[in-house]
A protein has these predicted regions:
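N-terminal leader segment of winged-helix/HTH proteins
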Residues: 1-55
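Basic amphipathic alpha-helical segments that dock to polyanions
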Residues: 70, 92, 96-102
Length: 142
């Protein structure tokens, strides 16, 4: 049995401190833009619709869990992802294909025996996880 992951508390503390600074900057920038523009209901609708595909993809069950697992392990095989997350093979296969199709992960097949399939984050996938971490930690804080 492996020891529990100890980076979580220290990492959370560091991320939360940096996140507070980033949030202030984003809030300031956002408010500056909003003050300069009059947003119509159509503008608002168009903005939300332009992000709908990303909302649907990233907030589906298992998507962020898979990406988070990959950032912690760098490269990882199908079986290890399945065991780590407790997801069934069919669902995991579908999610991995979807994440690969949208450019978040790569799939590398190494000829065997045994045949080995490993997954890794692309730059887009890594950046997405790094951007999601503050949201995840902030949302899970008590």
């Amino acid at each position: 049995m492996s020891a529990p992951l100890t980076l979580s508390a220290e990492f959370r503390k560091t991320v939360e401190a940096q996140m507070a600074q980033v949030l202030r900057g984003i809030d300031y920038t956002f408010n500056q833009i909003i003050e300069k523009q009059k947003i119509t209901p159509k503008d608002l609708k168009d903005e939300v619709e332009s992000l709908q595909e990303t909302f649907n993809l990233l907030f589906q069950k298992w998507s962020l869990e898979i990406l988070y697992t990959l950032i912690l392990k760098d490269t990882i095989g199908f079986g290890e992802i399945k065991k780590t997350l407790g997801v069934n093979s069919r669902t995991l296969s579908d999610k991995l294909k979807m994440l690969q199709t949208y450019g978040y992960i790569t799939r590398d097949v190494t000829a065997g025996p045994p045949l080995r399939v490993e997954y890794a984050l692309t730059v887009k996938g890594k950046n997405t996880v790094l951007l999601a971490l503050p949201l995840l930690y902030y949302s899970s804080s008590k």
